[in-house]
From Swiss-Prot:
Similarity comment: family membership: Belongs to the WD repeat ARPC1 family.
Protein name: Actin-related protein 2/3 complex subunit 1
GO molecular function (one): actin filament binding
Per-repeat ranges for WD: 61-99, 105-146, 151-190, 212-251, 349-383
UniProt keyword annotation of Ribonucleoprotein present: no
GN (gene name): ARC40
Principal location listed in the UniProt entry: cytoplasm
Length: 384
């Protein structure tokens, strides 16, 4: 484990926690607890200011890769896995967690999980073409699920609850972005959706809206106060839509798909993915557009090759479209000629793809810091 600070001012902290990909992470409400996935385990860390996270619990009941983790407002941890199971972990006074198996009733891997805002139910996406909405049944003392099936035709990659705890946005590999009703009788109240612009009646499992994107949907996030949804797709686009307007799309400046997004405020969104650094987009009068890169590696400053004596072929254009090709060519030529790569390049904090972004700090209704996890086993905190 290591704790370090980057030269880039947008990077607050870098935690190298494990030597395996981190597919999902989550902080507790007070940011004192950090849960990360690591193969078949969920590692729970205690976090304090300016010190590395300290591991204090390992949640071990899954026997296949854990795909997602989330923490409720009450401190309960939920995990889901490729073993087709989900567990709710109740924190105990001695610092341990008590697991409770959730009856998902699916025959394929569970892929995503998210708590509803009230912390009394959660939704699990799966490769079984099913969304399982799970809640606690006091009579039988266990967590049970109700299924949303139609018209889902493929794996569910991502889920997001509206602030009212009823509307559930879902995206997956069938190329559709959909909004369903996750209303649970006896748990949710009709007053919570009274006056909603999305409709008048919300029976469980009802399809409210759908939009066809034509490529995998990797992540989705509500902006509830504006009744808007943002999602990122494998075609390298960020898309924003509401209940009446057509989809507004903006392309990633580097052409690489994003895996996750976070609303910063009503008019700004930060995305992260295969470019290994966050990218900020903003809304202007003409629509959404690229605003700036955060913690982007500075490939343009790397030294030219001198061993080959042929620097002309690397000088070329320095525009954005040619940067990747030039830097890749330089890297492999240096490996071939010198056995190493020049180290005067400022690298980004993440060395591999960013898989998930989460809000970390907020001030006056605006997100000021976000956290990320990646395939390099790092947790990074950025200032926007």
């Amino acid at each position: 484990m290591s704790f370090s600070n980057s030269k880039d001012k947008s990077v607050v902290a870098v935690y190298k926690l494990v030597k395996a990909p981190i597919y999902s992470h989550c902080f507790s409400q007070d940011k004192s607890i950090l849960a990360v996935t690591c193969e078949t385990d969920c590692l729970v860390y205690r976090v304090s200011n300016n010190t590395p996270p300290v591991l204090f619990a390992t949640l071990k009941d899954h026997d296949k890769t854990i795909t997602a983790v989330d923490i409720s407002i009450h401190g309960r941890i939920v995990t889901c896995s490729q073993d087709r199971n989900a567990y709710v972990w109740e924190p105990l006074s001695d610092g341990t967690y008590k697991p409770t198996l959730v009856l998902l009733r699916i025959n394929r891997a569970a892929t995503s999980v998210t708590w509803a805002p009230n912390g009394y139910k959660f939704a699990v996406g799966s490769s079984a073409r099913i969304i399982a909405v799970c809640y606690y049944e006091h009579e039988n003392n266990w967590w049970v699920s109700k299924h949303i099936k139609k018209p889902i035709k493929s794996t569910i990659n991502c889920l997001s609850w509206h602030a009212n705890g009823v509307l559930l946005a879902a995206g997956g590999t069938d190329g559709f972005m959909r909004v369903f009703s996750g209303f649970i009788k006896g748990l949710d109240s009709k007053e919570s959706v009274a006056g909603s612009p999305w409709g008048q009646k919300f029976p469980f499992g009802c399809l409210i809206r759908e939009w066809y994107q034509g490529s995998y949907i990797h992540d989705v996030e509500w902006r509830s106060q504006m009744e808007r949804i943002a999602y990122v797709a494998h075609d390298g686009t960020l898309n924003v839509v509401d209940y009446q307007s057509p989809v507004q799309s903006v392309n990633a400046p580097e052409g690489l798909p994003y895996r996750s997004l976070v609303w910063i405020n009503d008019h700004e969104i930060v995305c992260g993915g295969y470019s290994c650094h966050p990218v900020l987009f903003s809304e202007a009068s003409e629509g959404w557009k690229f605003a700036k890169n955060l913690d982007k590696s500075d490939n343009n400053k790397s030294s030219a090759l001198t061993a080959s004596g042929n620097t002309d072929e690397l000088s070329g254009n320095n525009d954005e479209s040619s940067t990747f090709g030039i830097s890749a060519l330089r890297k492999f030529k240096e490996l071939d000629l010198k056995g190493k790569v020049s180290t005067d390049v400022q690298e980004s904090a993440h060395e591999n793809a960013i898989v998930e972004l989460r809000p970390f700090a907020e001030s006056n209704g605006q997100i000021t810091q976000v956290s990320s996890c990646g395939l390099d086993g790092k947790i990074v905190i950025y200032t926007i």
